[in-house]
């Protein structure tokens, strides 16, 4: 992979993934990403969100190594990876399409990448290697029995459902001969189901055994000892970085790198080698992923026998078995229906937490961003607009674009003139802003008022008493009743205003109502720069 920009910076100490001044320019001269800077801590769930063409997927593909970085620097777990091939970056990617092999079972789909690729592996000392191999052998035997009983349990569940359907059919059959025939079939099913309780008991027993040996294996790995060495390759990279920093006159940074070099030259780290996993190791990883994703009963099925949600779990499982440093997800839920998307959102977050993973997730759906992210990166036309927690983004948008993009229904915007604490709208409506809201800030004469639908309240309530100067009269154009609340659509200064109001009493179309703004939660934007004033 080509990159004209060599190492200039090092990865910040508390950063697990660091993108520094990343640009992407295609051969036709189109620039997709501009000066992208982001430091991601270990175990964070970062969401890139924005409209189509904003550069979010391009940035993700540069992280994966599927797109060349035109300029800038990328670090993963302290390693400079601009020139590292995708397969050697130790990342796992989940795409919008499930990308499953239709002719393979779920088990083989999960195991395939482990069979064909060499995996970065720490080299255990002989004694610990023998101990861990022994536990892995025991656990593999239990998994083999567990898979067998799972298959038997699945078959018995099908028979049980068949019996229930037959009993239901029997109640509606009036023909005596047909009824007798169905009763015989039910009797045959009863014989086949005679040991269903024993199978359930064995399933629970093996389930406990899996937990027992899994805990033993985890404990053994946590206490294991590995072959250690001084990482000469890392030391060489640091020496190059020091030389480059000095050649650019950055003595402060050079000294910081010298401290890091001294530590690297005196601190042994585990020896890591690329090797093919054994059959036992692959089997353990597959069953571990299937157990986490609750798809153990589907291991022998082909993808065509699975629902959309189950296929997406298998796609996630293919990433999990890699034991990757970073999970990259490119709109993985966009092929699912609305109900399943909600379910899978929570499952992905649970999975992220269970694995203590570091996840970077791309979506155009602001609901996914708000409900899943530790931090959100909002993008527009290749530029970062704002980085922050969901709460920060929602409450303190950086500019007009962010304010309008986040929130459903979207924030209402109205042009206004400002003078001496008073907003004057195009229809000459005036709203006086409290001094506490202005708080000494400089406000230009031309502004845009932003107010969220949920911050518009009835004109006879508590907020109206607090902010009587914000009361306005509206004529209802549309009244959408959503059970406990209304979405009221009205015309205000030639624009559609949406208010989210509790459904305490009926509201009819063409009715005139009074509402007020919660002036503590409004936003003002500079009409020229579109930046948020407050």
Language-model regions: role of each:
Residues 49-51:
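The feature captures the beta-strand-to-loop junction immediately N-terminal to the Walker
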Residues 68-73, 107, 122-128, 381, ...:
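Conserved coupling/switch loops of ABC nucleotide-binding domains, chiefly the family-specific signature
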Residues 72-80, 127, 196:
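Conserved ABC transporter NBD signature motif
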Residues 64:
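Helix-to-loop junction immediately C-terminal to a conserved catalytic motif
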Residues 105-117, 269-401:
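ABC ATPase nucleotide-binding domains
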Residues 3-4, 426-476, 505-534:
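Glycine/charge-rich catalytic "coupling/switch" loops of P-loop NTPases
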Residues 80, 115-118, 124-147, 187, ...:
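Conserved ABC ATPase "signature" region
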